Amino acid sequence: MSGFYKYQGGLSVWLESSNHKDIGTLYFLFGLWSGMVGTSLSLVIRLELAKPGLLLGSGQLYNSVITAHAILMIFFMVMPTMIGGFGNWMLPLMLGAPDMSFPRLNNLSFWLLPTAMFLILDACFVDMGCGTSWTVYPPLSTMGHPGGSVDLAIFSLHCAGVSSILGAINFMTTTKNLRSSSISLEHMSLFVWTVFVTVFLLVLSLPVLAGAITMLLTDRNLNTSFFDPSTGGNPLIYQHLFWFFGHPEVYILILPAFGIISQSSLYLTGKKEVFGSLGMVYAILSIGLIGCVVWAHHMYTVGMDLDSRAYFTAATMVIAVPTGVKVFSWLATLFGMKMVFQPLLLWVMGFIFLFTIGGLTGVMLSNSSLDIILHDTYYVVSHFHYVLSLGAVFGIFTGVTLWWSFITGFVYDKMMMSSVFVLMFVGVNLTFFPLHFAGIHGYPRKYLDYPDVYSVWNIMASYGSMISVFALFLFIYVLLESFVGHRIFLFDYYVNSGPEYSLSGYVFGHSYQSEIFYSSIVFKF
């Protein structure tokens, strides 16, 4: 991968390594590859919608492209990069641990992911693809898809789920057992806290998804009737089970980005800790906790009674409180800093701005009376893309910008990286901001054609997506150029406020051969 430590043993290092840095690098490469495939599919969607009329010629094909785009981006791009990549690389370093708690389990949890991805790609090529959307609702996924594509998608989700659960157990035990004795819970860095809460949510919610899709599998193949109303089942059970996983999942995607933004704001300001760091920890815990009890706000239109809708509306609005605490704490941390024009500052400010917009549209959608009108329109699509495409993905870009030199030992071109930010910022906003208006005017999701009245919004969105794709290519060029340019990372301006910066410059193959005792932290008594 890079010039910071020599690999011995060729290919077997990548296949068999139990070193957290090697496995983290594999996760990054896998996430990049999946992200490129997912982005290509999103471009296909935007080209189809660029003007009225048909490009793909089949609604089933269009829906299977949407399904593949969602599953690739969620399970094979954001999660491997955030938790597998940044988590594997930085968590042991931030805890003063020599490696992960179960190094070989770590290796297994990575190699389950390419298997899962090949299965979901196979599903796209069987019987006109799996056109169910990533939610895989019955009866569309049972009677509506009699072929093998949905079965392949279910096996893919099983593989990805097992991988995530194994990784989550590993991260939890590492945080609990391998923490340096001088780092108490309240002194752990916020990135470690976000990863810890994230993996807790994974362990809590993924078995529920596994149960739901296993029941779906038996409904399809073994003549059971869990979700078939004609024989006493209820498709709403599936929706409740799926969204009990699906809502914590969106917090699983965004929480590590919160941690990255917290670390970046420390880096930028040179402060010892984030403003209100204990409050930030409680906000992370609150988001994780409340995120588990609001799942049915995805289901306002299925005929829930008024009391249930009132509860889920209120509970969903409560999540805005800890999220607001985080946003204002980041701003308070950045307040008073010496403003130096650099890519990291741009990414952090961009994240805070875009995530806040996504959060505000979320507060609107949490109202059940409004959501009944806006449900399954492009307003919802714009909301979750502002939180994920412009939140989690900007978090990944921020993490790469922050830790690139730390991980590789090379320095990227700062002006080029700033150009990537400007292009990406313009592109994603041009893509998703106009679609809010299309959604308010009643433009529904998951249709491959539309009336001419919506064409202005769609043309703007399609141009924006092309700008974003160009920005992505420029980003990859910047990273490759940093290797080719071979500008060695010599020193940093960073004020030392974490165990990872006690290492000499960039990172070598094995860190913390003996336990460090981190003396600038208040000791536990």
From Swiss-Prot:
Pathway: Energy metabolism; oxidative phosphorylation. Binds 2 heme A groups non-covalently per subunit. Binds a copper B center. Fe(II)-heme a binds at residues 69, 385. It is a multi-pass membrane protein. Its main location: mitochondrion. Its cofactor is heme; Cu cation. InterPro entries: Cyt_c_oxase-like_su1_dom, Cyt_c_oxase-like_su1_sf, Cyt_C_Oxase_1, Cyt_c_Oxase_su1_BS, Cyt_c_oxase_su1_dom. GO terms for biological process: electron transport coupled proton transport; mitochondrial electron transport, cytochrome c to oxygen. Keywords: Calcium, Copper, Electron transport, Heme, Iron, Magnesium, Membrane, Metal-binding, Mitochondrion, Mitochondrion inner membrane, Respiratory chain, Translocase, Transmembrane, Transmembrane helix, Transport. It is found in: Mitochondrion inner membrane. Heme a3 binds at residue 383. Gene3D superfamilies: Cytochrome c oxidase-like, subunit I domain. Component of the cytochrome c oxidase, the last enzyme in the mitochondrial electron transport chain which drives oxidative phosphorylation. The respiratory chain contains 3 multisubunit complexes succinate dehydrogenase (complex II, CII), ubiquinol-cytochrome c oxidoreductase (cytochrome b-c1 complex, complex III, CIII) and cytochrome c oxidase (complex IV, CIV), that cooperate to transfer electrons derived from NADH and succinate to molecular oxygen, creating an electrochemical gradient over the inner membrane that drives transmembrane transport and the ATP synthase. Component of the cytochrome c oxidase (complex IV, CIV), a multisubunit enzyme composed of a catalytic core of 3 subunits and several supernumerary subunits. The complex exists as a monomer or a dimer and forms supercomplexes (SCs) in the inner mitochondrial membrane with ubiquinol-cytochrome c oxidoreductase (cytochrome b-c1 complex, complex III, CIII). This is Cytochrome c oxidase subunit 1. It comes from Ascaris suum. The lineage of its organism: Eukaryota, Metazoa, Ecdysozoa, Nematoda, Chromadorea.
